[in-house]
């Protein structure tokens, strides 16, 4: 199936999923004219009420230019389409299950997650989505990219900084579960405790 809008054409390769609400279908796709540029996640939004809300966070004029993962958005055939860059590779969840990363590598992954979210400067709702361990892709050099699957679309409009901090807290406890359980690193213990107690008001406070 080909989706066309103006001079853009996207070929839908396979279906990723339908969201729990049933209002959004997600597909893996490629640009028909520029297949070498990689893959995309195409979100097909059938519910126009959701589409109207998404317009505020998925159009180029409403988001930061640095949010490069957002490729395009448009109306076509009575539906609203949002196109994101698709990150291929092993998820953080899979990497943690493998248990192959040493402490230094896991610290670097956490640092790269922070660096990437600040670099992209994405809307809070997508940051909340990106900070899920199954949406974080880790490459062989420990670089980090994100996927966007609208997992909790109904909650997007309620996301505040405290929800983002909770997501980061969860990642820290998973990435460094061994060290926290054994109490083998005082710095990590103090950092995790500060997160638990809500000592950081903003994500930037954790990074600096």
State what each model feature region is.
Residues 62-67, 88:
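Flexible N-lobe loop architecture of eukaryotic-like protein kinase catalytic domains
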Residues 69-80:
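Short beta-strand micro-motifs within the conserved protein kinase catalytic domain, predominantly
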Residues 96-112:
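Activation segment of protein kinase catalytic domains, centered on the conserved DFG
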Residues 126-128, 138-207:
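C-lobe/activation-segment region of protein kinase-like
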Residues 115-127:
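Protein kinase catalytic-loop region centered on the HRD/HxD motif
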Residues 87-97:
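Structural motif in protein kinase domains
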Residues 2-64:
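ATP-binding glycine-rich loop module of kinase domains
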Residues 131:
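Hydrophobic HxD+1 residue recognition
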């Amino acid at each position: 199936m080909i989706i066309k809008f103006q001079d853009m054409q996207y070929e839908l390769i396979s279906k990723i999923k339908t969201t729990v609400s049933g209002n959004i279908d997600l597909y893996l796709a490629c640009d028909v004219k520029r297949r070498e540029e990689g893959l995309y996640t195409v979100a097909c939004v059938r519910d126009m009420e959701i589409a109207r809300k998404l317009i505020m966070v998925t159009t180029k004029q409403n988001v930061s230019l640095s949010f490069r993962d957002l490729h395009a958005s448009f109306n076509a055939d009575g539906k609203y389409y949002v196109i994101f860059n698709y990150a291929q590779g092993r998820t953080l969840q899979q990497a943690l299950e493998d248990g192959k990363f040493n402490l230094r590598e896991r610290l670097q992954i956490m640092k790269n997650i922070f660096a990437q979210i600040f670099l992209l400067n994405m809307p809070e709702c997508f940051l909340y989505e990106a900070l899920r361990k199954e949406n974080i892709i880790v490459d062989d050099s420990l670089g980090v990219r994100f996927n966007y699957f609208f997992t909790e679309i109904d909650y997007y409009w309620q996301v505040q900084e405290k929800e983002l901090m909770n997501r980061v807290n969860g990642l820290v406890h998973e990435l460094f579960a061994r060290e926290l359980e054994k109490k083998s690193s005082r710095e990590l213990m103090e950092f995790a405790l500060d997160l638990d107690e809500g000592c950081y008001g903003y994500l930037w406070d954790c990074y600096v």
